[in-house]
Amino acid sequence: MSEEFGRIIEKGFETWKNNLNIALPFILDSLFSILFVGIVGVAVAFVIGFDTTAQFFDRLQIISMSEGQEMPAVEAVSLLLLIKPYVVHLILSFLIIIIGLFIIITFFEAGAIGMAKAATEKGGTGFADMMNYAKKHVISLLLTELLIGLFLLVGIVFLLPAALLSPELFSGQGGYGVGTLILGIFLWITYMVIVITVLFIAPYILVIESLHPIDAIKTGFGFFVSHKLDVILLLIFTVAIAIVSNLVIGSVPKVGGFISTFVSIIIVQPLTTLWWVRLYMAKTNKPLYVNELLSHPDDLSNEW
């Protein structure tokens, strides 16, 4: 007998309380991401020259702090002229940062899901679980995320009608074209929301079941079809928690942003991962850890 939604939330929270170290992958993710961006930034500054880099930030600060209209425009042109010889370097460094961050985030995401699985299944987890699952599944998880990204890009077809009417958009009679563009954007956003919702659990399934990317996506789709309400409820629930915590904590003067980030890394993200892992494991009748000292007698039959 699978757990009900409320029970999944309750038990997931209990698992988190007993395994606060599940925050480790998210902490390391943040630290390594910052370190990586810093290393690339220093490398770029070394290539283009530290004096040029200092001038870039000085002019950028002038633009951001100036209240007038004329000065920012002048400084903006000056800034563009300053970076023009280094456009290729900047584009290359940007691509390196994007690819590097994608790998770092995916590595620790696989580790976090693996830790959540171990904690849900055995009642405890540790650094070894994170490394084992991360090394084993990082490549497959990267490919899965890329495939889902491609599915999202397919929605660009909704903008094709507006593209065909592009001459009208820039003419004096572009009302119909603008309306088509707005409708296309709306349909694309709707399509992306649907794809994200349907395939949201696929990365978790890949790590839990040790599947290949295509199989993980197929299984994720099948799981959504069988458990639509639970998936949608958990998605709304976790997104609402993230938004509310950011709004409430982020509104604290001066330190709100820092505290909000800290809470997200230490509490919200680990809890969210545990809930999604437990949802799949509970609904597919996977073995779940039972704390016999704290659990109700009925839990033994419900969770095993």
Residue ranges with predicted function:
Residues 99, 103, 171-196, 202:
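Membrane-helix boundary elements
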Residues 105-135:
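Hydrophobic transmembrane alpha-helix segments characteristic of membrane transport
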